[in-house]
Every structure is written in structure tokens, then in C-alpha cells.
């Protein structure tokens, strides 16, 4: 079965910026989904901030294998209830791909537990993304680097946790460098942060970027059944111990009593 993927877009500049509309007439989310649907292994649909429940209902998320997130101007407009909902699904095994300015999204900062801050400059400068982990599944089919003629610069320090893997490192025309492709795991869910994606440049029309995102969806897809009880913390009775066991010492909790949270 194809990997069920939602491309979530903030859809703000897509509607109110003529520059963005000229590059992505149907919105960035639609352009990304269309490129993903070129793959026989992916079935991509879209959701936007303005949809009811931001397009991320419990039922829809329950049937989603990978969620792609792009946000910029309206991070604080995302309801905390939806952020909690997405986090639960990531813990259960849904993959999450966070693009560009999504580093400041509520969901990414919550999952990272850090400010996710960085330095930046909007000057249309050249970016070269070096593949520093060439055997990683996310960069298969790519050359030694991806070159983008125009990009918004992101610079270090990038206040995120040390990743499981650093897949790409960017060099910018102005001299800065940035860790541009980072992998994480939270609970059963795989997370990939990918730096490029400023809305005033046709980055999501770039063939290398399109290939990388297809690879990233396949990497983030967890084939195992969802870990539905990931939040449960049962009190296991002494009678269920695997070896003979005698209770010793004073106790705080009674048999069958739930733990404190």
C-alpha cells in the first residue's frame, strides 16, 4: 500500500503574496504533494491552517503514515489541541518531516524541547547543500551536493538537540554554514528536519529537492503497527512478575492503583 502522506501548509503567504503566488499558484503545499504523487510508493494529500481542525482530525491522523509540515508567519495560530494530537501520533509511529521555517513551529519545538533558534538573512544568495552521509536512504540518487541559486540563509548556532544523524550541511554565498538535514526519533516516530524552502524562491520545483523529499517520506514511514498505548504506564502486580517475588519494605501505592503524573 502507498505511504499515506499529508502535506500541511500554513497557506498565508500563498494567499497574500503575489510573488509566492507567481511561483506556487496553487500553494506550496499543493506543489509538494504533486511532486510526491509522482512516486508510485506515495499517496499525498494536503491540509492547511484555515481548514477545520487545521485539516488534522483525529480520524485523518490515525490513517496518516507521514506528515510534512511547512509554517512561517502563523505558528502561534496553530491550536495547542492539534499540536498535542500530532505529537501523540508521532510518539505512536507517524513520521514527521519539518521544512525550513517550520523550525519555529509549535510541534517541532515541543518535540525537540529546545528553542530551535538560528541566525538568518534574506538576500537571495547561493546555497550548496553538501551530502555528508552519502549512504543514508534520504540522499540516494543525489550527487555530492544540491545547489540552489537563490536561498534564504540560515546560520549556526542552531539550537536543537544533537541529532541521530546529520545528513546534509549547507554552505552559503555569504560564508555561513548550517546543519540542513537532521534526523531524530521521538517514541516510535521518525523525524527529519530539512532546511530549504523559503517561499519566494522555486525551491520545491527543484528536481533534487523533489527527489530528496520522496526519499524522506519513505525513510520516515514506520512499517510497524502503531504504538497505540505509548502513553500507558500500568502498575504491574507482583503476581504477574516473571520470577517468584516477595514484597519487601513499605509501599506508597495500593494494588491496582494508578501511578502519579
Features from the language model and the residues they span:
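Short glycine-rich His-centered loop
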Residues: 2-22
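Short hydrophobic segments within beta-strands
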Residues: 6-10, 99, 194
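Cell-envelope and extracellular/periplasmic
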Residues: 10, 71-72, 197, 221
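A short acidic/glycine-rich loop-to-helix N-cap element
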Residues: 16, 200-208
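Helical hinge/lid and interdomain linker segments adjacent to catalytic or ligand-binding clefts
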Residues: 17-105, 255, 259
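Catalytic beta-strand/loop cores that center a nucleophilic Ser/Cys/Thr
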Residues: 42-43, 62, 118-195, 229, ...
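A glycine-rich, often tryptophan-bearing local segment used as a flexible ligand/cofactor-contacting loop or short
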Residues: 74-142
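Short, hydrophobic alpha-helical segments
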Residues: 213-228
Amino acid at each position: 500500500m502507498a505511504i499515506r502522506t499529508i502535506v500541511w501548509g500554513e497557506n498565508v503567504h500563498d494567499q497574500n503574496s503575489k510573488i509566492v503566488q507567481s511561483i506556487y499558484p496553487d500553494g506550496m503545499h499543493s506543489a509538494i504533494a504533486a511532486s510526491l504523487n509522482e512516486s508510485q510508493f506515495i499517496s499525498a494529500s494536503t491540509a492547511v491552517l484555515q481548514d477545520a481542525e487545521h485539516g488534522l482530525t483525529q480520524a485523518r491522523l490515525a490513517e496518516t503514515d507521514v506528515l510534512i509540515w511547512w509554517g512561517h508567519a502563523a505558528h502561534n495560530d496553530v491550536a495547542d489541541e492539534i499540536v498535542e494530537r500530532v505529537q501523540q501520533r508521532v510518539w505512536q509511529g507517524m513520521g514527521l518531516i519539518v521544512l525550513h521555517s517550520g523550525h519555529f513551529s509549535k510541534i517541532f519545538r515541543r518535540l525537540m524541547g529546545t528553542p530551535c533558534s538560528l541566525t538568518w538573512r534574506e538576500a537571495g544568495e547561493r546555497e550548496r547543500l553538501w551530502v555528508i552521509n552519502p549512504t543514508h536512504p534520504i540522499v540516494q540518487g543525489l550527487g555530492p551536493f544540491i545547489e540552489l541559486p537563490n536561498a534564504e540563509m540560515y546560520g549556526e548556532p542552531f539550537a536543537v538537540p544533537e541529532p541521530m544523524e546529520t545528513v546534509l550541511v549547507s554552505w552559503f554565498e555569504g560564508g555561513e554554514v548550517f546543519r540542513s538535514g537532521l534526523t531524530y526519533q521521538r517514541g516510535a516516530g521518525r523525524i527529519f528536519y530539512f532546511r530549504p524552502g523559503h517561499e519566494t524562491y522555486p525551491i520545491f520545483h527543484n528536481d533534487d529537492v523533489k527527489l530528496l523529499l520522496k526519499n524522506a517520506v519513505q525513510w520516515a514511514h514506520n512499517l510497524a503497527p502503531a504504538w497505540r498505548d505509548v502513553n500507558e504506564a500500568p502498575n504491574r502486580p507482583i503476581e504477574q512478575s516473571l520470577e517468584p517475588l516477595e514484597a519487601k519494605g513499605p509501599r506508597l501505592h495500593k494494588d491496582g492503583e494508578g501511578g502519579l503524573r
